[in-house]
């Protein structure tokens, strides 16, 4: 009708269920999966969270739900994520047997990273969802989401470290 009504943002919630994010439901005795966690800048506001000793990375447990997860399951997923971060920051990080590749699916990581970089999404580095399926030691990255700050809608960056800066809108390390 020609009347400007402003901008609209279409979005959706991430749900763990069939045809969405399919993670096998665990019984209280299961430990190895499935889980959904998030590297989460707002972890302080969440009831189920942990922080890594190395770099104090804030992580929230998104699935199983707060009222369903057991203490043992919380400890298991926190310990498993801490093994990943320890491997990433170790001197042998690229070693096929002992490096980070034993704890994360490289292909899903690269997809997540490239989508974040191509879209210029500042949330890519401080709101990262990962899943871990039963009997699979690797974290899978995704689904990608939260594009409200992408495509030049936010000109700032959440620095990976103190040497990160924007150069022609691309993140570079110096």
Predicted regions, residues:
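Phosphate/dinucleotide-binding and metal-coordinating scaffold of catalytic cores
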Residues: 1-174
């Amino acid at each position: 009708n020609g009347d400007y009504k402003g901008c609209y943002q279409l979005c959706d919630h991430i749900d763990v269920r069939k045809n969405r994010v399919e993670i096998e439901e665990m019984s209280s005795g299961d430990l190895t999966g499935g889980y959904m966690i998030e590297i989460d800048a707002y972890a302080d506001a969440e009831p189920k969270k942990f922080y890594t000793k190395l770099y104090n990375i804030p992580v929230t447990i998104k699935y199983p739900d707060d009222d369903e997860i057991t203490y043992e399951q919380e400890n298991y997923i926190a310990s498993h994520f801490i093994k990943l971060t320890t491997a990433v920051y170790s001197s042998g990080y690229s070693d096929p047997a002992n490096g980070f590749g034993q704890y994360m699916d490289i292909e899903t990581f690269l997809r997540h990273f490239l989508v974040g970089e191509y879209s210029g999404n500042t949330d890519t580095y401080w709101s990262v969802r990962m899943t871990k399926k039963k009997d699979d030691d690797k974290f899978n990255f995704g689904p990608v989401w939260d594009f409200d700050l992408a495509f030049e809608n936010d000109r700032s960056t959440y620095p990976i470290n103190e040497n990160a800066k924007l150069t022609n809108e691309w993140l570079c390390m110096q």
